[in-house]
Amino acid sequence: MITVFVACLFQCVSSLPAKLYIKTTLAEGIGKLQTVIGIDNDIVFAYERLYGDLTLRNHTAVGETLFDLAGSLEEGKNSTVDRFLGHVVIREFHRLHAGLQYVSVQNFSVSELVCFVNNNTQLSGSYVFLARNTTYVQIDLFNENRSFVHDLINVSSFLQNRSLHVLSFYARRFCVEDILNFYGKVVFGDSKYRPPQVFSKRDTGLLVCTARRYRPIGTNIQWSLHNQTVSDDHTTDDFIRTEISGQLLYSYERALSRALSMTHREFSCEITHKLLVTPALLTREDAFSFKGFVNPVKESEDTFPRHNFPAPHRKKFNKLQLLWIFIVIPIAAGCMFLYILTRYIQFFVSGGSSSNPNRVLKRRRGNDEVPMVIMEVEYCNYEAENHDMELHSVQNVRDDSIAVVCGNNSFDIERQSIKSHESFSNVKLEMLPL
């Protein structure tokens, strides 16, 4: 039991630094924005109260969304609220782009939600887009003062305050999820961007390519076959919620499905991202691809430039270590406990006397190489019955001597003299089992 307690204590202590680091980092990043977050929460709560008038059936008509959010959402009482909030956020993105059509001929891939850590180690998020095909406009979603938006655009015509509030609420939580890597690694710096985690799998006759922490703008994911773009059979976009340290963080996950056949084994899943790097505001295209069957685990993280943030490494136990901690060590500790308890009971049941036959046998076994047979003589006055047979059975066990116990006294006699010994001629000898 002590071993189990020590193992559990070691496991808790080993993971404590990483947990403290995550909570401290979140507290610092969110604490600096606490006032603004309170305002945005009021806006979002107002949207949640309107949910009774907006059912899932008329979301497409009201929200004008192109995304299908009917995928696998987190189960729980707040899943419907998350689903609705996802529709609201995507609708406001579309509302922004609808207004941008008046000043820009570009599509979604020239706009970007940029998350980064500035020189003061403060979390920042900006919405950057190309206006009139010549000018980049950057909107700081963490700053309530919008007066610095570029003069070339009449912002009031399409950038409504409600949209900016909702996008600010989303961006703040998305950027925390985007920058804080729960394994102790942060990607920012020159690129200020962490690419989505991409993996593929087979699923009931389909090849599914999934981009986790996917951004709905600035990124394009598609199937490719022999360097040619291939349309997908089905696309699913999920609005994912993560809760840590009491804060809700949001991100997207997009999945492409393609019917699988023997002739289409060369399918690859490609992601292209047109990154608008701030403050230089230079367009740079980062692209990568991987085969669907080669290594379907997070290949994107090894493709884009990455920067490591000094953070404690959280120890992870492998299956063998978990087997020892939760199965082998508890069983061994339990067996040891039962053994000690049994010996303890035997000692007190036997009375602890050195003249006890069992204790005599233990001493003799420890000193003699040949096992000793204990012969108990009850009261030393019984008449022997079938005396020769008793002695014959003794001779089969030991060749030189036997142990005789009479009352509180024990002694050894030679087998050769036992027949002629007068004091034992009228004694019944009973063999005790070893």
Swiss-Prot record:
Locate the transmembrane regions by residue number.
322-342
**For this UniProt entry, what is the primary localization, expressed as one broad class?**
host cell
Q: How does the record classify its membrane topology?
A: Single-pass membrane protein
- Localization per Swiss-Prot or TrEMBL: Host endoplasmic reticulum membrane; Host lysosome membrane
Q: Which residues form the signal peptide?
A: 1-15
InterPro entries noted in UniProt: Ig-like_dom_sf (IPR036179), Ig-like_fold (IPR013783), Ig_C1-set (IPR003597)
Example of a GO biological process term: symbiont-mediated suppression of host innate immune response
Keywords in alphabetical order: Glycoprotein, Host endoplasmic reticulum, Host lysosome, Host membrane, Host-virus interaction, Inhibition of host innate immune response by virus, Membrane, Signal, Transmembrane, Transmembrane helix, Viral immunoevasion
User: What cellular-component terms does GO give this entry?
Assistant: host cell endoplasmic reticulum membrane; host cell lysosomal membrane; membrane
Q: Which Pfam families match?
A: C1-set
What does the UniProt function comment say about this protein? Plays a role in the down-regulation of the host stress-induced NKG2D ligand UBPL1, which enables immune cells expressing the NKG2D receptor to recognize and annihilate infected cells prior to viral spread.
The molecule here is called: Glycoprotein U20
Q: Which organism is it from?
A: Human herpesvirus 6B (strain Z29)
Please name the taxonomic classification of the source: Viruses, Duplodnaviria, Heunggongvirae, Peploviricota, Herviviricetes
